[in-house]
Amino acid sequence: MQIRYFLALSLLPQVVLADESPTASASQCVIEPPVPRIVSQPGLSAADQEKIRIVSDRSNAEMGKQAIFTGDVVFSQGDRHIAADEAILDQATEQFDANGNLVFQDSIFTVTADSLQAQMRSNRATLKGAQYWLHGQQVHGDAEKLQITMNNNLILTNTNFTTCPPDNVSWLLEAEKIKINSEEEWGEIWNAKLRVADIPVFYIPYMTVPVSDKRKTGFLYPSFSTSTTNGFEVSAPYYWNIAPEYDLTFTPNYMSSRGLFTKTEFRYLAGEAQSGRLNLEYLGNDQMISGSPNRYLYNWQHQGAIDKNWRVLANFTEVSDNNYFNDLKSDVNRATDNQLSRIGEVSYFERDWDISTRVQDIKVLGEDEKPYQVMPQVNFNYRAADFWNNLDFGFNSELTNFAHQDSDMNTATRLHMAPSLTLPIHGPSGSLTSQVKLMQTNYWQEKNNSGFDGLDDTVSRTIPQVRINGQINFERFTELFDQNYRQTLEPQFQYLYVGYEDQRGIGIYDTAQLQDDYFGLFRDRRFSGLDRIADANQVTLGVTTRFFDDHNQEATKFSLGQILYLQDSKLGYEDNLFEQNQSTSVLAAELDTRLSHDWYLGAAIQYDTNSSDNKKTEVTLDFRPEANKLLQLSYRYVPDLLNSNTNDLVNISQAGVRGAWPINDSLYFVGNWYYDLNESRSIETYTGFQYESCCYAIRLSYHYRIKTNYDDNIGSAVIDEREQFESGVYLNLVIKGLGGSGPLGVSDMLNDGLFNYRKPLYLRN
């Protein structure tokens, strides 16, 4: 005799477990059933696990007829048990009935019921007046009738479930019927009513929920907000699990001041090592802009590998207007992003060489001047280690065609080749790398604008380069502030020689000046791209010291360096702009340190010793006593920064405070505040409170930020002109146990703003 039909009961609690992830305090939320657990005999063999054992105070059985068991009846098979006051087994019809303090238990859950009727021949069973509890979890509920079909599917009639403690049921889902398909691993719910604080809040005639950890179609958690620019907002994402390799999320977002804003995200897997994403966003007839224009976004991203050698990459974004990200909360870019990437690349890799082809078109929002398009670029690189007498040979090359959307702009084709010989010498206490390189570049330029008279039709540029880079590592044990440390001292030097050639006949296609931080002092060029290769005859001196504690954790790292120019650089970026006519570069210093167990400091400064000017300063001070507690103070100063929107030089002097702190076990606070010291105004304020209990989580936040308003290139001016600042209130609610995206987190609150949270300590542990 088998009782395998009881196995289907183990599917029931999984209805409310889909997409749940245990939290640190999950053990405090476990709800135990009110009946004691029946303990299985340990050490049973596989054969004994299948045997059925029946124990009762009294029994009356006759072969081929009814067998009656009364008084503390216990049926056991492995770790599955049925306890009842009375049980009857009709051997002729193979019907099994049990009633009176009925309890079913296995390793997954416990079910109590008034009665059980089972047909062993068809594997059907019905439990009436059922209550269930999931072991080690918080899911529990009632059912007037629980039926097990011959296919091991479940049907619950007049049922409910919750994840709240029995003495404090904050929410309860009631349903007329729930059907669980064990093979498809999904559940259907009819006439569902959600009660919050015993008050019905909404009714759903039909819904589906997952019954396993597999992705499943259904609604995700809604969110609510209100802001000065969009009005009242409500969004209700819907997730569609199309196939194992495809899914789609559709989010209708209603904004009272603008209209219906829809967002669609389609994700896919292609083969074993490729994936991609397609985003479509649309707002029809934006009511905030005169003329009510349509606003849209489409974005496609794809990356992956084709067998072991081929790599593919694609990223394409288009928006309807300059202020799209500024006005609407997109899933693709942040409000501060003003560049759209359109890149496609195919690469092939071997051990010693690689080749790639790419096209690129960067769109800068709010700027009249458009960057050049790369249509296309072919790169070929070759590497030969220990090529001859310990010398490494390298060959880098590229062929690039520069196009432009404006037919009046000049265009060009560029061929660049750079063979090199490198002698690397590595030892236990240092290294020395010497390299000679010859850079040959040819340009074929088409002058479409007569205003550029200085442009040459063809250019052949040959520039030699010599680079010697060395580092020595010293180490000692020392004591500092009554603590033992292992200290390293790492002096580093670089000599760089780059020949000079007049490059004023070459247009600017992909070149910009690079920033000078500590690591930038040891680069071999001042500009990105290849349109300008600056001559150099210079020595870079730098030193880094580190302190490691007894656990070999890096507690402090300090770096200091500067370039000594042996002769002036003759080459500028455009005409004579940015020519290097000083004896030294900025003095760059960086510090990352753990001041104590809880305090961390990060700082970086670039100081011009020639003019005694501070060129850049960044400081962050963190207090992190525990993983979920944070207080950060920050300051940033950058003078003469080019504003790409106005082409004006501006000074940045900003101070900020960011914090995340638990008020108690359930209530969490996250906030930040950034202040512009030059303009004497707040540029961003974010305050959020999150409450999380065993069965629900709710987040209420307030956001005030400065807006980056560009000139409108759709419709007419914004009604009542664009606001310089935006403020809003946001509400998110998670009811644990109803599927969706799971509990709210604190990390996303830290990054929900113009300035992402960044740890100041980048130590090599």
UniProtKB/Swiss-Prot annotation:
GO terms for biological process: Gram-negative-bacterium-type cell outer membrane assembly; lipopolysaccharide transport. InterPro entries: LipoPS_assembly_LptD, LptD, LptD_C, OstA-like_N. Coiled coil: none annotated. The keyword ATP-binding does not apply. Keywords: Cell outer membrane, Membrane, Signal. Residues 1-18 form the signal peptide. It is found in: Cell outer membrane. It comes from the Bacteria. GO terms for cellular component: cell outer membrane; transporter complex. NCBIfam families: PRK03761.1. Together with LptE, is involved in the assembly of lipopolysaccharide (LPS) at the surface of the outer membrane. HAMAP family: LPS_assembly_LptD (MF_01411). PANTHER family: LPS-ASSEMBLY PROTEIN, LPS-ASSEMBLY PROTEIN LPTD. Component of the lipopolysaccharide transport and assembly complex. Interacts with LptE and LptA. Belongs to the LptD family. This is LPS-assembly protein LptD.
